[in-house]
Amino acid sequence: MRNFTKQYINGEWVDSASGETIDVINPATEEVMGKIAKGNEEDVNKAVDAADKVYLEFRHSSVEERRELLDKIVKEYQNRKNDLIEAITDELGAPLSVSENVHYQMGLNHFTAARDALDSFQFEEQRGDDLVVKEAIGVAGLVTPWNFPTNQTSLKLAAAFAAGSPVVLKPSEETPFAAIILAEIFDKVGVPKGVFNLVNGDGSGVGNPLSEHPKVRMMSFTGSGPTGSKIMEKAAKDFKKVSLELGGKSPYIVLDDVDVEEAANATTKKVVNNTGQVCTAGTRVLIPESIKEDYLTAVKEAFSKVKVGQPREEGTQVGPIISKKQFDQVQDYIDKGINEGAELFYGGPGKPEGLDKGYFARPTIFINVDNHMTIAQEEIFGPVMSVITYNNLDEAIEIANDTKYGLAGYVIGKDKDTLRHVARSIEAGTIEINEAGRKPDLPFGGYKESGLGREWGDYGIEEFLEVKSIAGYFK
């Protein structure tokens, strides 16, 4: 049992104002695995005051000092590798291999990328007699989701520290323990008091007062569109800057010159990775009519090899859905797919055989999907693929862009000119050609209803900065 019922404020572990707690459920067992503090407005006020008090000092710290701080964090993060992997496996239900190779590694990559970005980042620029200065925006409120407990927290924290902005972090109450370990890391390496503050709790008790606090100058949020909209509304009252990374319904365009088996394996991975609980999941798979039958044979074979199971069992690739609420939502979407006329090709409702305990869903493929069906337009956040056929490339691009989202897109094939044309044509913030993978120094963010702003590397640092021009500085 993990019991962490204190908040981390101004460099100390302190009692939460309410004295109340929240149970954290292990999704693989459906049992309580720990408790965290249920914070409230009083906790938020203390945390924001601590951050505001240190703001000017941290803003004026040198680039070298902040780089050294990030370097210390990188080293201690590596020292806590096993603790982070264990926490993520327990709270998220991620298989041990996924906790290590995806979650732990992505967090490390972001701290490293922010540290390295400081080697060349230009905080000042001379333009003739004038000076352009980039300086920390002020106290930043960070609200992070449950599906990537280290990735989403690390990329925001690393950028804020690099920029010189103190923060108040509210991690998801469903996966809070990785963030608590990060707090322990920061405490050990000597992050200055007030620069990092952790307030656990729920959205109404912590997220809302954080978004509305007059001393908070920026809100950075990753999560659902409706919640992002509410944060924008609250932040708009005093014109806070807002950075949002929201949902997606990403297209995966398969070209007609592709190696079919390779395409089947690649598209399968993009759907089942992290149990489909990925905002960039390529769940709309667009297949040329000419290779449809060969692809369906290959993708069914690929899905049949995916092992769903308990996170600590050897060979498990896909763990449980995060919660009963989310599991029920995935089941509802599968039912909608059937009821709206899509053909169930693989998987379907219910749990995999032998997995009655835990929120395990069956990896599922729908075929003959119309792009206007619910399962093709709404983010499911589960391992559900929608296969849509197309007759020509223009039609594929039109289908790909016929969505309110624009977070990611994928294309796989052989002809380089066609691959590049498709990549440029998809209306999304990040595109992968032939499973190239996203490096942590590339910008990450979405078009349309997938968000505002960009994160990762130097682009992430920019989000936490204000720009000042000083005319006549060099006269």
UniProtKB/Swiss-Prot annotation:
Alphabetized UniProt keyword annotations: NAD, Oxidoreductase
Active site residues according to the UniProt entry: E245, C279
Tagged with keyword Oxidoreductase: yes
Classification via InterPro entries: Ald_DH/histidinol_DH, Ald_DH_C, Ald_DH_CS_CYS, Ald_DH_CS_GLU, Ald_DH_N, Aldehyde_DH_dom
PROSITE patterns for the chain: ALDEHYDE_DEHYDR_CYS (PS00070), ALDEHYDE_DEHYDR_GLU (PS00687)
Any single Pfam family the record assigns to this protein: Aldedh
Highest taxon, organism lineage: Bacteria
EC category: oxidoreductase
Keyword NAD on entry: yes
Substrates-to-products reaction catalysed: an aldehyde + NAD(+) + H2O = a carboxylate + NADH + 2 H(+)
The EC number(s) this enzyme carries: 1.2.1.3
Residue sites binding NAD(+) per the record: G201, D202, G203, S204, G205, V206, G207
GO molecular function: aldehyde dehydrogenase (NAD+) activity
Family: Belongs to the aldehyde dehydrogenase family.
Protein name: Putative aldehyde dehydrogenase SERP1729
The species this protein was found in: Staphylococcus epidermidis (strain ATCC 35984 / DSM 28319 / BCRC 17069 / CCUG 31568 / BM 3577 / RP62A)
